[in-house]
Amino acid sequence: MPEGILEQKKGGAKNVQMKRNRKRRTLSAVKKKRKTQRNIRLGFLILGIVLVVMLIIKINNPGFFFNKYYEVDTKAVDASKPDIDVELLTPNPYSRSQEKTDKITGIVIHYTANPGATAIGNRNYFEGLKDSHETKASSNFVVGLNGEIVQCIPTWEVAYASNDRNYDTVSIECCHPDATGKFNDATYRSMVQLTAWLCLKFNLTEEDVIRHYDVTGKICPKYFVENEGAWDQFRKDVKSAMAMDKNPE
């Protein structure tokens, strides 16, 4: 075969192979592009689903992603609020430091341990610590013998009541008529109502209601420590009150 014709055939075969290679590269590039586009679409889909889930969680539990103070603001919370006599303490290092709390994760029940004392009397004791410097002590609320509720510290400020749980709990001091520490009916009713309202306010359940005893082992509140059945009933009553507040007839 003449050398010129052979060279032409070789050149033609080479051109065909080059075209095939270009076609393969083109197809490969197209496949990669399509795969990349699919991955991008899948990524956006997953991101969208995550954002929707996060939005749902945030609507139902606004503080889920943060460790900052927040309150639930609904008609049910407003309607369930008990009568509260707001008598805030004077800012001072011994009973009202004005330190901000973290996200509220619990309600702590205390008893005053001074039989017959009144709610305002206990509030005034906390107020007096700014002058006596006797100790550091306070409570967000005090429930009195007639069912009155006195607020001493805003719920977004730390009260000196529950040791290492001061920063993530709201404290309730409760008055009692005698040394048994048992609460009378008026005090008990207000305790249940106040605790239920606070649970709704901070998106908590009755399981988040604890005793001072559960934090430190201190016999406080005495009657609820010595009578577990009474404590269990209190939390059940709080649960019932919350259900009524959420679904009023």
Give the positions of each predicted feature.
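N-terminal catalytic cores of peptidoglycan-degrading enzymes
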Residues: P2-S162
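Short coil-to-beta-strand
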Residues: N163-S171
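Soluble periplasmic/extracytoplasmic beta-strand elements of cell-envelope proteins
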Residues: V108, V142, S171-E173, I210
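Solvent-exposed, acidic/flexible segments
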Residues: D102, E134, R165, T180-Y188
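Short strand-loop junctions, especially beta-strand C-caps/beta-turns
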Residues: T112, C175-P177
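Basic/polar, cationic surfaces and motifs that engage anionic cell-wall
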Residues: P2, K33, I40-G48, L55-P82, ...
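Surface-exposed loop/turn and secondary-structure junction residues enriched for glycine/proline
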Residues: S97, L129, C152-V158, N163, ...
